[in-house]
Amino acid sequence: MTSRPLSPLAIFDLDGTLVDTAADLVSSLNHTIAAAGLAPVTYDDLTHLVGQGARVMIKRAFALRETELPEADIDPLYERFITHYRAEMPGESRPYPGIIETLDALSQAGITLAVCTNKTEILAVPLLEKLGLTRYFAAITCGDTFAFRKPDARHILGTIEKAGGDVQRSIMVGDSINDILAARNAAVPSIGVTFGYTDVPMVELEPDVVIDDFAALTPALFEKLVSKGAAAA
């Protein structure tokens, strides 16, 4: 029996890359920390808080407000966040301009698509479903899919395996240091977007390519990146 050939693969982060979720993250986080009497966070605070899932975001919000978070309070606050976020979904979250056209163009060029996010599965998958995006992706791996998450290389490598992708012809697209480091750790070329939630200018994170909008992410750019990666391997 002939084995199925591996596919070229474009992997996308979710929050701050595929979908602008900032307003809903801030809303649910403020709903959560209000139970502890903390002052609300703002959009400007968000870049310091996101990237490692809801539990870490809550812990960082407490640290931002210089307030101790007892270990026993973490799970109840996490459940409060999850309940609020799921109830409001998709809220104000919307795909970034141009992403649908980009996903269509990449798919039509024979490039398989996947999502690799540190967002937990019970939040990530329903959000993508409600926004009509799941149909594009051969695999969606989340912060709790494996026993590790970005920036661990195995999160990307596991995503490639689940999507039937070719590690030598895969790229990672993201907005944060976790995305760029994970790609680097997995020896996969990276594209950094400038419109996400990083608190460090994307160019300073040194992805292989920086783009300001999805019109720049063409099949030709994909081929250029994977060819460059193959030559360097």
UniProtKB/Swiss-Prot annotation:
Pfam families given in the database record: HAD_2
GO molecular function term, any single one: metal ion binding
Cofactor: Mg(2+)
Assigned protein family: Belongs to the HAD-like hydrolase superfamily. CbbY/CbbZ/Gph/YieH family.
GO cellular component terms attached to this protein's record: cytosol
Matching Gene3D superfamilies: HAD superfamily/HAD-like, Putative phosphatase, domain 2
Known pathway: Organic acid metabolism; glycolate biosynthesis; glycolate from 2-phosphoglycolate: step 1/1
Protein name, UniProt field: Phosphoglycolate phosphatase
PANTHER family: PHOSPHOGLYCOLATE PHOSPHATASE
GO biological process: carbohydrate metabolic process; DNA repair; glycolate biosynthetic process
Gene expressing this chain: gph
InterPro entries linked: HAD-like_hydrolase_sf, HAD-like_sf, HAD-SF_hydro_IA, HAD_2, HAD_sf, PGP-like_dom2, PGPase_prok
Binding site for Mg(2+): 13, 15, 175
Origin species: Agrobacterium fabrum (strain C58 / ATCC 33970) (Agrobacterium tumefaciens (strain C58))
Documented EC number(s): 3.1.3.18
Residues forming the catalytic site: 13
Known function: Specifically catalyzes the dephosphorylation of 2-phosphoglycolate. Is involved in the dissimilation of the intracellular 2-phosphoglycolate formed during the DNA repair of 3'-phosphoglycolate ends, a major class of DNA lesions induced by oxidative stress.
The UniProt record lists the keyword Hydrolase: yes
Keyword Hydrolase: yes
Class in the EC hierarchy, top level: hydrolase
Catalysed reaction, written as an equation: 2-phosphoglycolate + H2O = glycolate + phosphate
Lineage of the organism: Bacteria, Pseudomonadati, Pseudomonadota, Alphaproteobacteria, Hyphomicrobiales
Keywords: Carbohydrate metabolism, Hydrolase, Magnesium, Metal-binding
